[in-house]
Amino acid sequence: MDLFVFFALIWPPYVANGSAVLASRLKWRHPVDFGHNFVDGRRLFGDGKTYEGLAIGVVLGTVVGYLPNLLHPTLTLLDALILSVAALLGDLLGAFIKRRLCMPRGHPAFPLDQLDFILMAMLVRSLYADVPVEYIIAASVVTPIIHRATNIAAYILRLKKEPW
């Protein structure tokens, strides 16, 4: 496994998923689901998934996610954009599933919370480029550890209301 290629592949989704929380600092936020409920009477995604968070995640995931490629070209800027968007769609899917399971916003749901974004990014990438199985396995192993550490940091920095 080429560690630089692996890092270049997971970095845009990590940045996109991790930076979306910065929207929580904004005074006005607009939920992606506009407060609407699904047919089961529960919110589609909840107040934690906002257009502002998606925008911040896509922009930072694309730009900051692309930076390692300036040293060693592995991905294009378009790849970083696609991986960032896919990661945030994976996070939205995870929120949708959690709402269907009657889990409130912020409730921990291992491994859904930790893997939804990275697995969606890998799935979408695999639709147009080769993603070695060992990269998917490695991402599935390291992501929960990194996710936990970054969530604790975001909690300490008061960017998140809970450390998970």
Swiss-Prot record:
Subcellular localization is given as:
Cell membrane
Q: Which GO terms describe its molecular function?
A: CDP-2,3-bis-(O-geranylgeranyl)-sn-glycerol synthase activity
Q: How does it sit in the membrane?
A: Multi-pass membrane protein
Instruction: Give the catalysed reaction(s), semicolon-separated.
Output: 2,3-bis-O-(geranylgeranyl)-sn-glycerol 1-phosphate + CTP + H(+) = CDP-2,3-bis-O-(geranylgeranyl)-sn-glycerol + diphosphate
GO terms classed as biological process? glycerophospholipid biosynthetic process
Which pathway does the UniProt entry assign to this protein?
Membrane lipid metabolism; glycerophospholipid metabolism
Transmembrane feature ranges: 3-23, 53-73, 77-97, 126-146
Cofactor(s) needed by this chain: Mg(2+)
Q: Which InterPro entries match?
A: CarS, CarS_archaea
Which cellular components does GO assign to this protein? plasma membrane
Q: Establish whether keyword Chloroplast is in the entry.
A: no
Highest taxon, organism lineage: Archaea
Enzyme Commission number(s): 2.7.7.67
Q: Which UniProt keyword terms apply here?
A: Cell membrane, Lipid biosynthesis, Lipid metabolism, Magnesium, Membrane, Phospholipid biosynthesis, Phospholipid metabolism, Transferase, Transmembrane, Transmembrane helix
Q: Which PANTHER family match?
A: CDP-ARCHAEOL SYNTHASE (PTHR39650:SF1)
What this chain does, per the entry, is described as: Catalyzes the formation of CDP-2,3-bis-(O-geranylgeranyl)-sn-glycerol (CDP-archaeol) from 2,3-bis-(O-geranylgeranyl)-sn-glycerol 1-phosphate (DGGGP) and CTP. This reaction is the third ether-bond-formation step in the biosynthesis of archaeal membrane lipids.
Q: Write out the similarity annotation.
A: Belongs to the CDP-archaeol synthase family.
Report the protein name in the record.
CDP-archaeol synthase
The species this protein was found in: Pyrobaculum arsenaticum (strain DSM 13514 / JCM 11321 / PZ6)
Give the gene symbol. Answer: carS
